[in-house]
Amino acid sequence: MKKLFLILFVLFGLNSSVFADGHVKRILSTSQTGMGNDIVYPSGKAKITAFEFTVPVGGPVVPHTHSFPVLIMIQQGEIELTQGGKSYVYKAGDAFIEDVGVAHESKNIGDVPVKAIVVAMGVEGQKIM
């Protein structure tokens, strides 16, 4: 778990004074999911997996759950996430954490494919996808 916090600190905790000629833009700093619930971490040896995810125009993401936090950073397009009868819309530039253990589904509601960077914050031996 300490490694997870170190990785998250490196990704999100740096400020622009660290880079002499660079620029750092904070994408997300939160203790809650995009649905307003507290973030819950699994116990065990941390294993972070990052990948690019694409949803075609009109395409759904079938109902599913996660047993670990998932950070989603929308790079292109617009997606509607539905969970517990409520809908949340995220567009390019938005970042959010999905709830752990709660069924949700999504749909591309824009006119271009949705491209997102997805960071799964699981543990060793846990199935990610």
Question: Language-model features: where?
Answer:
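A short, N-terminal "cap"/entry segment at the start of jelly-roll beta-barrel domains
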Residues: 4-9, 14-47, 96-97
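Histidine-centered metal-chelating micro-motifs
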Residues: 60-62, 80, 96, 100-107
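A short beta-loop-beta micro-motif enriched in histidine and acidic residues
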Residues: 44-47, 58-71
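Glycine- and acidic-residue-biased ligand/ion/polar-headgroup-sensing regions
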Residues: 68-84
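Ligand-binding loop in jelly-roll beta-barrel domains
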Residues: 101-126
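Short acidic-glycine-tyrosine-enriched beta hairpin
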Residues: 85-101
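Conserved hydrophobic/aromatic beta-strand scaffold that supports enzyme active sites
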Residues: 50-52, 71, 95-97, 118
